[in-house]
């Protein structure tokens, strides 16, 4: 009866590992898409910056605000790119501090450290069901820590690009106000 319980628990842990790995993959894809959005935003803005430079008859205060907004947009896009890259690039430093085991039958890092497939097979056969369950629980924990870290970086990257778009909206409003002032005069 105990063996059946372990098999169900192992199956559940396998499902948890697959789900968490799916979250990690999805976050990587979203971060890559956000990098593309950042690149497109920076390209479009750099090509259209001239349309905003001479507004309000080159008023000194407007020019200061204009350059301040451009600086802020650049910083916000840079921070979004940086955090998107941090979200994509694997970082196991924080996880290794929480987990010291160097002998896993589930982790690709430790599977690849075997001499060959036969060596891994022998090692795998020697593992008890309790040991396999413990190994899978440790892998679930590690993947969950990685997924959480990726989510935090991605969420932060999104908040930075939102700030950049808020500044861009302010520039567009300035352009609209200048257009209305010119049309009414």
Swiss-Prot record:
Query: Where is the major localization of this protein?
Result: membrane
Where is this protein localized, as stated in its record? Answer: Cell inner membrane
Name its GO BP terms in alphabetical order: defense response to virus
GO cellular component entries: plasma membrane
Q: Report a single Gene Ontology molecular function.
A: nucleotide binding
**Transmembrane intervals:** 32-52, 63-83, 141-161
Further details from the record:
T5 phage that escape Pycsar have mutated major capsid protein pb8 (D20, AC Q6QGD8); infection with these phage elicits less cCMP production. Ectopic expression of the capsid protein in addition to both Pycsar genes does not induce effector-mediated toxicity, suggesting another factor is necessary.
Protein name as catalogued: Pycsar effector protein EcPycTM
List the gene name. pycTM
